[in-house]
Each structure stands twice: as structure tokens, then as C-alpha cells.
Design a protein with these regions (language model features):
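A glycine- and small-aliphatic-rich helix-loop capping segment at beta-alpha/alpha-beta transitions
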Residues: 55-63, 89-93
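Mobile beta-alpha loop/short-helix "lid" or hinge segments that flank ligand
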Residues: 1-10, 61-63, 95-114
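N-terminal beta1-alpha1-beta2 submodule of the flavodoxin-like/Rossmannoid cofactor-binding fold
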Residues: 1-58, 117-143
């Protein structure tokens, strides 16, 4: 799901169930409450993740015992490391469980095409490791 596809005003009230959501937000509320796990993908902006991502989880804050994968990217050498650290704080604050293995993508334009296709095949191992570890955590938390 792409947060940009949904037009959330800045937080007006926390949504505690799909039924409590305004009609136009009920489809995303059902997805958020029904999700068993999340992978958060964001570019780094000014040392943190996007405001749209923060606003989404402000609307739907309680994600107890759900696995979270963190993927950050930047054109620079650090690959969104500062944003990843901020996301770990967010995950903790909404009672999620962060996968210790994150996918940090430095020089993103050299690793992925604009359509998301992996173009640096040497980076495939990092993607595979992240995916395997996140799936392991998500499966364990679901029991």
C-alpha cells in the first residue's frame, strides 16, 4: 500500500476500529487493523522518515505484537540510517516488534530503477536476507 494513494488530513482523531473510521477511510482502516505485519519503506528527508508515514500511524497507532520491517533509502552513503533509527522509535511507540535486520539502501538510484526493479544484482543478497528475517519474525509472532 502506498501512503501517497490516501489523502489524510493532519490527524484529527485517532481511529480505534475500522467501524470508527470515516466512510472514505474505512478501506484503509480495515487494511491497517487486519494487517498481520508491516514493512515500512521510506526515503530519508532531513534525517527522518516522511510526514505522511507518521500521520498514517498517528491515525492507527496501536499495532501490538505485529512484526515491522524497516527499509530506508537515500542517494547518499548512509542510505537513510538516521530515518531507520527514527522508525525504530515509532515501532516501539505503537507497540510493534521491529525486525533487527533492516534494509538500508545507500545510493538508491544505483541499486533500484525508478519503477522499483533491482538493477544492482550484487544487492540482491541484502534484500533476500532482510526478507527472510522479516518473514521469520512475522511468522513467529503469528504463532
Amino acid at each position: 500500500m502506498d501512503v501517497r494513494d490516501w489523502h489524510f488530513p493532519l490527524l484529527q482523531e485517532v481511529i480505534s476500529s475500522p467501524e470508527a473510521a470515516p466512510e472514505h477511510l474505512q478501506p484503509i482502516a480495515k487494511r491497517m487493523f487486519g494487517a498481520q505485519a508491516f514493512i515500512l519503506v521510506t526515503p530519508e528527508y532531513n534525517g527522518t522518515y516522511t510526514a505522511a508515514l507518521k500521520n498514517l500511524f498517528d491515525y492507527f497507532p496501536k499495532q501490538s505484537h505485529k512484526a515491522f520491517g524497516v527499509v530506508t533509502a537515500s542517494p547518499g552513503a548512509m542510505g537513510g540510517m538516521r530515518a531507520s533509527q527514527q522508525l525504530l522509535l515509532l515501532v516501539s511507540g505503537i507497540f510493534g516488534v521491529a525486525c533487527p535486520n533492516m534494509l538500508i539502501v545507500p545510493g538508491v538510484e544505483k541499486k533500484f530503477a525508478p519503477d522499483g526493479e533491482l538493477i544492482d544484482l550484487g544487492y540482491a543478497k541484502a534484500v533476500e536476507t532482510f526478507t527472510r528475517e522479516w518473514l521469520w519474525l512475522a511468522e513467529r509472532l503469528q504463532g
